[in-house]
Every structure is written in structure tokens, then in C-alpha cells.
Amino acid sequence: MASPNRLIVAVTGLPGSGKSVVARIVAEELGLEVKVMGDVVREETVRRGLEPTPENVERVARMLREELGRAAVAKLLAERLEPGRSYVLDGLRSVEEAEVLARAGWRVFIIGVYAPRKQRLERLMRRRRSGETLWEVLELRDASNIELGVGEALALSDYLIVNTGSLEDLEFEARRAARVAICGGDP
């Protein structure tokens, strides 16, 4: 069973939803370190002697899931977390990942961040990447994330933020979610 001082606040959402902003604000509010789930895969990509390009990282993520199961990234991350410390995780991909962390002794609180596709596309356009059209990229990334279990993690989140307003609105909701995570109920 997790002790109260072993908390993982895991943030999930589709690309462009605002999950990294929420993770940063929650970490700031609670004085916790942010661990980015994608960094685990990027590090593993380099460890395997590959350049950490988006294609290679995606390929290694799939290989890890074939080798270690759907919760592969959480299994690798759990080995790197310091026992007795609490963290904010940016990029939880599935309920299975949350279950792995809970079995390792952390109390897991999931914050889901939802934003409509049009708003996510606008946000991603500001981070513009060359190559395919952003719509194609968003379609592919959404499909990949949903296949990995993000939809289920969103549906089962302990606190859901609907990110359709201003940055100030998002900050308010993220701080509120942090308070709920700590007290385990209403803020």
C-alpha cells in the first residue's frame, strides 16, 4: 500500500491538450519534480544506439511495449524513481501504466487534460514542424495515443480539465487539481 508521501500525479491527454503546461504548474504548486514519460523512451532509444528522431523514438516505444507489455514505459520509469519521493508525470499513456506505479507503492492521482481537436491543432501549429501537414500529424498522433490507451486514462482520470479557455483558466484549474491530489477530495 502506498504511503501518503509517495504520490504520483500523472497527467494524461492527447497532443496539444496542454498536459505539459498542467504538469509544470502542478509540480510548481506542490514543489515536486516533473518526470516526462517520453524522456524514458528517448533515453532508451539512445541506449540502443539510435538517433532519437521522432521515428526512432516511436519505433523503440513500440518495441518496448512488445518486449515488456503495454505498461513498458512505466515499468522502466518505476525503476528510476527514488523510493519515498513524490513526482508529477507528464504523459501517462494508459491505465496499465498507472497500475504499475500503484503496485510499486505510489498513490497515483490522474489528471486528464482535454481540448477539442481544432484547438489542439491551433496549438500544434504554433509549435510548427516541417514535413507532413499538421492535420495528418495530429491524426496519426491521436490514433497512436488512443491505441496506447490515452482515451481510457482520460475517461478514468481522477480530475478532468477541459482546456478551452485562457492560459489563466488553465493555470487556475491545474492549481485546483494539485490541491485535490494532495487532499484526496474537494479543494
Swiss-Prot record:
Protein name: UPF0200 protein APE_1753.1
Family: Belongs to the UPF0200 family.
Positions annotated to bind ATP: 13-20
Keyword Transferase among record annotations: no
Family annotation (InterPro entries): NTP_hydrolase-rel (IPR022970), P-loop_NTPase (IPR027417)
Higher taxonomy: Archaea, Thermoproteota, Thermoprotei, Desulfurococcales, Desulfurococcaceae
Keyword set includes ATP-binding: yes
Origin species: Aeropyrum pernix (strain ATCC 700893 / DSM 11879 / JCM 9820 / NBRC 100138 / K1)
Pfam families the record matches: AAA_17
Keywords: ATP-binding, Nucleotide-binding
Domain of life: Archaea
Gene Ontology MF, one: ATP binding
